[in-house]
A protein has these predicted regions:
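Short, glycine/acidic-rich hinge or "gate" loops at secondary-structure transitions
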Residues: 3, 204-205, 225-229, 249-258
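Arg/Lys-rich amphipathic alpha helix in sigma70-family domain 2
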Residues: 189, 238-253
Length: 293
């Protein structure tokens, strides 16, 4: 008797992801760390963002413990899935936040205390940032409890060297290569949208968007939102619209000069005149009717 023929159905190919907020947040975090100084690399990760030290209390400590437990659980689950090559229930890797010690929690405090003052930088001071030296992203400090239950600083942004003997520095860091690639991919993908891909100056719009992202890419504030994709998409949209408006204004000036010299303007100007006439009278389009007052 012949052996039966067995057929194996291959699983569906993995879904190709475009950009996720999780990946963007990770690269933003790594990029900002290059501008920071920490007592230990372990303190570069934070569990909770607060506006000032006075907000650290029993409630915020418990919230920070929960956040750290969630992060450790996800990290253990992802590592097990990569190692085993198969899906595993996430509940098996859950970490109880009550097992996390108080001294293991790190707080990110948004503050300008370590940023030098810059009197005269702006005439009218609207916020705290206007009275300090300009930096490329909101400054912060990392704090934690020591064994004596005292809060101590363990990290500073825009800082080089030791936390006590070091100095302010905002030029020694850089953006990660992965974040730069994400910006390029975001602009490339946006440039293929139906409402912008037909423009002859599509490359100029992409270039302006990339330039804008390199300038404001790290200004995303994690304490206000966890959706950097929307933040960057809005910046890219504004850059594209800006170039479109500039090109339209230049085209209008060129058409005005051509008409002043008795020459035919661009087809866009001519077609806009026909459409305006049609909208005003309804005669050219064949729709509607009525007399032209």
């Amino acid at each position: 008797m012949e052996n039966p023929i067995t057929m194996t159905i291959s699983s569906q190919p993995p879904k190709i992801k475009y950009l996720t907020n999780k990946d963007l947040l990770r690269e933003i975090h790594l990029s900002k760390n290059t501008y920071c100084s920490f007592i230990s690399p372990d303190y570069s990760e934070y569990d909770l963002i607060l506006p000032n030290i006075s907000k650290i209390n029993v409630r915020t400590i418990a919230e920070a413990k929960r956040n750290q437990a969630i992060r450790l659980s996800k990290r253990a689950h992802e590592s097990a899935v990569l190692t085993g090559g198969k899906k595993l229930p996430a509940k098996e890797f859950e970490v109880d936040y009550k097992t996390i010690k108080k001294v293991d929690v790190v707080f990110r405090i948004m503050t300008f205390e370590h940023i030098p003052l810059a009197p005269g930088r702006k005439k009218t001071l609207k916020n705290t940032a206007d009275s300090h030296d300009k930096v490329n992203f909101p400054p912060f400090q990392h704090w934690k409890f020591d064994d004596n239950n005292n809060l101590i600083p363990v990290g500073k942004s825009h800082w080089k060297g030791d936390l006590t003997t070091g100095e302010f520095n905002k030029e020694h860091g850089k953006m990660t290569n992965n974040l730069a690639r994400m910006f390029l991919k975001l602009c490339e993908r946006y440039a293929t949208r139906g409402n912008v891909r037909g423009y002859t100056y599509n490359d100029e719009m992409r270039g302006q968007a990339i330039l804008q992202l390199t300038q404001i890419g790290l200004q995303f504030d994690e304490s206000k939102s966890d959706n950097p994709f929307a933040y960057y998409t809005a910046a890219v949209t504004n850059s594209f619209v800006r170039i479109i408006n500039i090109e339209k204004r230049n085209q209008n000036i060129r058409d005005d000069i051509l008409e002043m010299n008795g020459m035919n303007p661009s087809w866009t100007r001519q077609n806009s005149g026909v459409s305006n006439f049609s909208a005003g009278t309804g005669a050219s389009s064949g729709e509607g009717g009525g007399d032209w007052d």
